[in-house]
Amino acid sequence: MSDKNRHMPLPSRLLGCLILLALGCGLNATAFAEESQFGYVYTTDLLPKGAMEVEQWLTWRNKKIAGVYDQLEGRTEFEYGVSDWLQVALYANYAWARAYHNGPYGATTPPEQFSDKNVGADARWSSTRFVGVSGEAIYRVLSPYTDGVGLAFYVEPTVGPSFRELETKIILQKNFLDDRLTTAFNFTYAPEWRYLDDDSTPSARSWQHETDINFNAALSYRFAPNWSAGFEFVNEHEYNSYIFKNQSNSGYFFGPTIHYGGKNFFITATFLEQLPWAKAHSDTVAGALVDGRIFDNDFERYRLRVKAGYYF
């Protein structure tokens, strides 16, 4: 290995390997109508009526304040085009994580998906979990190809043993340069409930809520047949209420994305790094904000997401 590659960050090397893997898939296929050009940002492109797709996601989240931290989140999804304007899906969510001296003041801190676990401050911890089952519906009101701008509404309920969520989105899309340049924006409002220790009642647990409010944007340019590349920006906010009050965290992420869409399949990879723009809020956990980055249990330094789908 050259000195240059030896010192390259691991997430960057992994993204490079994924790009080379996708390049080996060939260049002669025709892109499908609903191919997912972004890892985190949704577009208004839907499956045609009667079309079906199996999609697999894998997200790696890496590096906290110090110590050891890795989390893998998986999603296995089946999608169906009810009509040219309505798409539905059903999927399973699962996760694995490990942590050691990664949190505020050097304490071992599990990620949010495992926040119901009681872990000692000096423990070497790891665990796997079935998070829950999700349903999804996307209804497109406007198409960027016939109306000049795309507009769609998204709803996704999730139910699991210790987790509940109702995620909603407004999706906007605008294309330029004969549809070679795709831009998209998502607004997300997602109240969620976790079954956690109840601070007011010793030895008891209760459903406790928070709300995620996110503003995400992306652009992608088709630079060759079936190939596109661009950037994604993810801005996440957490509130200990159902409205814009009692904010605990805000994180800002930015990075490249690359996409290959074949006749019957696609693969997309997105790498994000947290930007040093975070600030303390009224409910921010003490010690979680370091050098302008937030490292509470749902925030980390790097994220790498790979999505692959097959159409039939």
Cite the ranges covered by each PLM segment.
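Transmembrane beta-barrel domains of Gram-negative outer membranes and organellar outer membranes
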Residues: F32-Y311
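Membrane-interface motif at the C-terminal end of an N-terminal transmembrane signal
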Residues: N28-T30
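N-terminal secretory signal peptides that target proteins for export/translocation
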Residues: M1-S12
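N-terminal start and proteolytic maturation junction detector
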Residues: P11, I19-L21, E34
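Hydrophobic alpha-helical segments and their boundary regions
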Residues: P11-L15, G39
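Bacterial N-terminal signal peptides
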Residues: G16-G26
